[in-house]
Amino acid sequence: MSTGDSFETRFEKMDNLLRDPKSEVNSDCLLDGLDALVYDLDFPALRKNKNIDNFLSRYKDTINKIRDLRMKAEDYEVVKVIGRGAFGEVQLVRHKSTRKVYAMKLLSKFEMIKRSDSAFFWEERDIMAFANSPWVVQLFYAFQDDRYLYMVMEYMPGGDLVNLMSNYDVPEKWARFYTAEVVLALDAIHSMGFIHRDVKPDNMLLDKSGHLKLADFGTCMKMNKEGMVRCDTAVGTPDYISPEVLKSQGGDGYYGRECDWWSVGVFLYEMLVGDTPFYADSLVGTYSKIMNHKNSLTFPDDNDISKEAKNLICAFLTDREVRLGRNGVEEIKRHLFFKNDQWAWETLRDTVAPVVPDLSSDIDTSNFDDLEEDKGEEETFPIPKAFVGNQLPFVGFTYYSNRRYLSSANPNDNRTSSNADKSLQESLQKTIYKLEEQLHNEMQLKDEMEQKCRTSNIKLDKIMKELDEEGNQRRNLESTVSQIEKEKMLLQHRINEYQRKAEQENEKRRNVENEVSTLKDQLEDLKKVSQNSQLANEKLSQLQKQLEEANDLLRTESDTAVRLRKSHTEMSKSISQLESLNRELQERNRILENSKSQTDKDYYQLQAILEAERRDRGHDSEMIGDLQARITSLQEEVKHLKHNLEKVEGERKEAQDMLNHSEKEKNNLEIDLNYKLKSLQQRLEQEVNEHKVTKARLTDKHQSIEEAKSVAMCEMEKKLKEEREAREKAENRVVQIEKQCSMLDVDLKQSQQKLEHLTGNKERMEDEVKNLTLQLEQESNKRLLLQNELKTQAFEADNLKGLEKQMKQEINTLLEAKRLLEFELAQLTKQYRGNEGQMRELQDQLEAEQYFSTLYKTQVKELKEEIEEKNRENLKKIQELQNEKETLATQLDLAETKAESEQLARGLLEEQYFELTQESKKAASRNRQEITDKDHTVSRLEEANSMLTKDIEILRRENEELTEKMKKAEEEYKLEKEEEISNLKAAFEKNINTERTLKTQAVNKLAEIMNRKDFKIDRKKANTQDLRKKEKENRKLQLELNQEREKFNQMVVKHQKELNDMQAQLVEECAHRNELQMQLASKESDIEQLRAKLLDLSDSTSVASFPSADETDGNLPESRIEGWLSVPNRGNIKRYGWKKQYVVVSSKKILFYNDEQDKEQSNPSMVLDIDKLFHVRPVTQGDVYRAETEEIPKIFQILYANEGECRKDVEMEPVQQAEKTNFQNHKGHEFIPTLYHFPANCDACAKPLWHVFKPPPALECRRCHVKCHRDHLDKKEDLICPCKVSYDVTSARDMLLLACSQDEQKKWVTHLVKKIPKNPPSGFVRASPRTLSTRSTANQSFRKVVKNTSGKTS
């Protein structure tokens, strides 16, 4: 600032700096500085300094006052927490005074200072505060306290786009709309000079109209003049991060706004496909796919994505040098994907959104997920012993969008005291202010009068409503009267019904007496039955004696003793059951006697109840008479009420006439007042104009000011007098209207009193009616209770009858059981002898089954080898056929060349030509014969294939016959094949030799004829007729040749079709063979289990000798484990979760079943060879960062060879080629560079290997998944152990499995680790690093595991 400037200009500039919200020394910033100083100094250790203590004692009270006056968190009511992040949370709040709804974001100061390298709160505040864009969430207020920063933003009730994509399948039309809005929003941020760096659906919010706005600018960074950014940390979400941002980790990152357009491409792909393009379950997998995006970006075949959409996605997901949007937004807007007829780029915000949220209130949070309460303790700043300045980084954060203090004032007001003209102007202004105040008062009086008129109108409306209510009440009374008459008729009807019911009850009582007499007779019968049961007991005792004798006889027998003892025990049990039945019969007799006594008591009670009912009936008749008398009196009162209502109606009509008259007068008054107001307004306008004229004259002439002033004052006084008179007249009229209103109020009160009297009478009548109805209901309830009791007694009598029938049936069944027992005793001896023979037969069957199982295994192996040999032979035959076709084609080409050479010498070599044509016909006939022979061979092959398929089906039933037939068929087939091959070879050799000799002869003859001297003379003598004949013959020969060629081509097509059919049959046979192999594997595991059971039986009973330990795998119980495990469903945990499968681990296989029913049917979905296992290990959070934290301790990983897998054809796709990635070899490890944003520790030094925002450079072995710091390799530290896993990564696969608990996971891992073979599988020894092509992901995604093709089982 120049020293020549006056103090006033300096003060003006300072004032502007204090008022400017973007200034670093505005008033809020200065207040924040004072507040921060007080917070940072107000500690006991610091107050020992006198200067600090004096400062606090001077400013602490004033700062506390300012804190109370400024905005604070207590000004808002918290409705709900709608979001939570690394630095704090987002709350839905309502302002207590204005009742407006906002979204308030809380940021912890402690967390932001702790992670200062990744906290960009200043950028977030500035973008939301000063963006002034409809595509950015607006910031209204920003304030702070000692623990938090608060940002009060507009509430977006539509939720984020993640919620929308989870609720809807997004069509391409919607995707076009939302992508266009994201493009415009990012353009707004880029135009402010910022890069977002974390564009994802979570940060795209929808307002109440469904339009999109960007939020969460905590990762934004300011661009330099060249539009670039320098950063050495990889900021963003793994799925949406660009390759250039990934490369910036640990190095000198230098990139521009094109990194945001990459995220837009990922977002568009996710909307259309439903998943991100570089999805993987581990961070290593996602990062390696992003770096290898040229090969890993693919589109699914089942999604109908347009070419324009694919083109746009590919244009976004490319290298930054060629990426769309690098040269500006206009090239994105011009893309064909955004062409449509529904909206334009300029009117996009005004169009209707595809999804408009349905909101119930201004605090509707249905589009946000419910969050659990954060129960963790919040960290705060520790009490310092010296000055730290924890509050200083946040000075100036406070922001108010509508600042009112330090409002603009005219700075030139202080200069007016110097000149006399300015003093006159001030005096005039004062007078003008006074006049304006008077006008303002008059306007207030006018408003008061209008309010009084409105109140009178409101009162009149109330009176009209009350009159309407009186009419409704009168109608209700009439309806109640009609209801009372209806109830009277109902009461008479009920009385008649009660009389009928009383007669019915008398009849029922007679029936009950009859039933009681029948029950007595039934009891006597039951007593007789009990006597018969005693006879049955005597018979039972005789049977017991017989049993004892039979037992003595059975004891004498040596081998039959065991079975007869069992039968004896069974008989004793049956006898005990019979005894228990007798006891039950006795107890039932007692129950019947008790029930008889109870029925007698009930009978006496019923008699007493009947007498009481007779008395009540007489009382009811008296009550009915009283009710009839009351009804007549009520009818008279109703007539009286009708007469009173008619009077009220007349009074209401009079009041309505009075109201109409008052309304007319009110309207007239309103017209007069409006006319006067208009005239006053016109006069005011004239005065304002005159005032302006006087102001203009004041500047020219100072002398005429006083005269104009006096004239203006006189005119204003006259006008004020006129206005006062008009006001008095208006007040008089208002007084008259108020008098009329008071009269109407008096009439209203009278009518209300009458109404109250009528309503009181009505309520009394209603109470009496209610009492009568209650009495009637009580009587009806009593009657109903009596009826129910009678019904229960009748039901009990029916039950007694049923019990009698049951007792009789049981006695009959006991007698039959005795007879059966006697019959069974006789048959037991016969059964024992038969059982001995069956035992011997079973032993023979066991030995035969063991022998059969060994034969079955050997036969299955032989059949497998034979099938493989036959498949190879078929392939060889196909190749031989193709070779033969090629030789035939060459022979035809040679014949064509011969024909052309012969056409040159057609006149000279007629004889030779005819001979050659004959030879060509012979060759054609020979070719036909050969083709027919080949057809026969193909048919034989087909027959052999059909025989093979039949043999495979008959394998299970007739193993011995099949092997003999297969051997005979093979021998015959080999002999025929050898003979055919030898014959074909000899024939072809002969043909070739003859054709060669003929060719040499023809050439020699041609040479001789050409060298003859007589050739020219004979040539001239040749006739034209001979030439024509030869031409005709040549044409015929050409036609025949063409026909032969067509026939040959047809034969080739036919054979090609047959070959294709054969190949299709081979594919079907392979699939069928695959299923058979899987079923065989499951059967083998079942056989192992059965053998183990047989071994247990042999140990306990020693029935027969079993096979040797080599055949049965002596440790079968230990080698087998089974249970429920979960596999990734469709290869995507994030969208589809886990799929449960029943897993069985036998000694050789791992079997996966969809359910237990498939296990019983031996129908596995996948089989793995244990011999092909490489590695089994528990996973870490970095391997499966998409899984929930609770599931990670339960997950483990299996690595196996491609050939060790055999699965159904449900989810198969070709094996993807290994992705080329740079890796480092060290001690057998193949390390891939990666970063960990989730908890992980170094396996070498046990130090943390992760960080949320700035993780250290790390390495992970893609074989054994060992993790370590990159520094260990760079510094050549000998801390890393050699790799324990040796296999070729290109030929290996992995699978993730989820156990039910952590203990189950440990059990599965320990069991499978024991199963891993010590030597690697053949063909999978570690390859050299030079020739090895690696994949980019150490931990393959779930999708690849599910979709890989089924490998061959060993």
UniProtKB/Swiss-Prot annotation:
Cofactor(s) listed: Mg(2+)
Keyword Magnesium found: yes
InterPro entries: AGC-kinase_C, C1-like_sf, HR1_rho-bd, Kinase-like_dom_sf, PE/DAG-bd, PH-like_dom_sf, PH_domain, Prot_kinase_dom
Post-translational modification, as annotated: Autophosphorylated on serine and threonine residues.
Keyword Acetylation: yes
Protein name: Rho-associated protein kinase 1
Gene symbol of the encoding locus: ROCK1
Species whose genome carries this gene: Homo sapiens (Human)
Residues given in the record as ATP binding sites: I82, G83, R84, G85, A86, F87, G88, E89, V90, K105
Membrane topology according to the record: Peripheral membrane protein
Residue span(s) of domain RhoBD: 949-1015
Comp. bias regions, Polar residues: 1330-1354
Modified residues (N6-acetyllysine): K647
